[in-house]
Amino acid sequence: MSSLNIKQGSDAHFPDYPLASPSNNEIDLLNLISVLWRAKKTVMAVVFAFACAGLLISFILPQKWTSAAVVTPPEPVQWQELEKSFTKLRVLDLDIKIDRTEAFNLFIKKFQSVSLLEEYLRSSPYVMDQLKEAKIDELDLHRAIVALSEKMKAVDDNASKKKDEPSLYTSWTLSFTAPTSEEAQTVLSGYIDYISTLVVKESLENVRNKLEIKTQFEKEKLAQDRIKTKNQLDANIQRLNYSLDIANAAGIKKPVYSNGQAVKDDPDFSISLGADGIERKLEIEKAVTDVAELNGELRNRQYLVEQLTKAHVNDVNFTPFKYQLSPSLPVKKDGPGKAIIVILSALIGGMVACGGVLLRYAMASRKQDAMMADHLV
């Protein structure tokens, strides 16, 4: 009986406990979809507006077209005319050599020079005409040229390879980005030709300097050798004068070997020729006007100097690189296309429209719940 009383007593207190209220954290997806469907016209209008804005932006955005060229070191067949022009100079014992790899490296070095690029842009009629049409002052012109120079790039195609991975050949990609495809190709091609001309001019100038230095060296050395030979001739003449005096004093008129006499000759002042022979030899020595007449080596040196003086280096047109891809005419602009911009703009517009509709619905629902709560109170 006691247990029955306890159960009845406990059941009597159940109404004192409030019932659990339903959870408000659940999301009714069907209701949200219904809300969006009712506002479909608003959503579509916003999406259309964003798509139109994206299309307009795609036309307003600056166009970027990139022209590219791929170059490698020159091949021997390209330099045949240059090598032929150096044949006569090499015969004259002139060490002349233009290394193809060094010429290519010099081309890349000058291509990456910012000062040379600015110099080219300032001297290029095409670029200056484009900038002058904008009617800008000197400071703005300098800024525009600096901005253009940043769009000229040279990339080593082997730089991305691993160190232990061998490369078959050296290759560089040269590129320039401009507002139009024609401008990109024209500027890149013109700059490559400009740098190539500088490399050719500098290489030939180095050869001319070597020729000038060699010629000057041989001239000065020949002059010194002539002085040495002249001094030796003067010493011989003076020695013959002393020998003549000694021969006259000794009474030796004829060569001693013609008389069958045995005379021990003086190594310093020879009298074996006799006074007559010494006198005749002295006349011959004094009659020499050009010391090179009796010196074959000196005459050969003089001939070399004459040939070096006549030699000259002709202007030979050669290319310090070989095109694997000539400056291309871009057919596709850089960056996203108009279709992608419009699609992304439409997606952003859809998200903004849906978010706005749902936010407005949430605020209206909260306001309605607050009014109902006030009404019940």
From Swiss-Prot:
Pfam families: Wzz (PF02706). Disulfide bonds: none annotated. Residues 63-338 are periplasmic. It is found in: Cell inner membrane. One of its GO terms (cellular component) is plasma membrane. Residues 1-41, 360-377 are cytoplasmic. Induction: Repressed by H-NS, induced by LeuO. A monocistronic operon. One of its GO terms (molecular function) is ferric-enterobactin transmembrane transporter activity. InterPro entries: Bact_polysacc_biosynth/exp, LPS_length_determ_N_term. Keywords: Cell inner membrane, Cell membrane, Ion transport, Iron, Iron transport, Membrane, Transmembrane, Transmembrane helix, Transport. It is a multi-pass membrane protein. The chain crosses the membrane at residues 42-62, 339-359. GO terms for biological process: ferric-enterobactin import into cell. Part of the ferric enterobactin transport system. Belongs to the WzzB/Cld/Rol family. This is Ferric enterobactin transport protein FepE. It comes from Escherichia coli (strain K12). The lineage of its organism: Bacteria, Pseudomonadati, Pseudomonadota, Gammaproteobacteria, Enterobacterales.
